[in-house]
Amino acid sequence: ANITVNMNIVANPSCKIDVILDEETGDVIKGEGNGRLNIRVGTREALSIRGQYEISKGEYTFNFQTFFKRPFTLKSGTITWNGDPYLAIIDMDAEYLAKNVDMSNLSSGSSLRLKDDIIILSHLSGSLKKPLVTFEFELPERSPLRKDYIVTKRLADFQNDENTMNKQVASLLLFNTFISDEQNFFSQQNTIGLATNTIGSILSGWLTNTFNRELEKATNGVVSFK
């Protein structure tokens, strides 16, 4: 027999979800979302999903080998399906506020002795399973360094070199400092893996798990996306 199930699902925006990523380190993401989806599946028909799921907000604390804890804030974003569930497209932003960062490696001038906060902005795009991750640095609105030409120029220069940007992001996450051109704490491969996979894999994994839980609840476990 050929059985086909066609469902229209409205995800409840008031639903709050906790996703345990690692029981040993205590990595948990808390999030909220909503959306309207059409899901079709049959005994002779592959799973098809169409529609958009919106992430309204979320929180995540990244534990690096249980020694470092770094709080991330998930901004609003979307996951869009046009049929094949594995080809979902994401568009999402996250940020991490690094506090009291040593700025000495950014400038040889008066800013050498300054410490200040800096925001790491991360944008995720492309495939849900393998997102593209780009970074950007932003100084808080009240930061005195916003008027420092050398510091702002250095931060802007990082944008033009993906490897350098990833290296600086990794250094901020682990050591709360920028590193100079002469320092080489990370190999290129490890740096890219730490900076992009830390955020990209975690967030894409969370998005997948979050949606899958909503889907299983809506269909009483009949349909899941894995």
Residue ranges and their predicted role:
Residues 1-226:
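Interface/linker segment at the passenger-translocator junction
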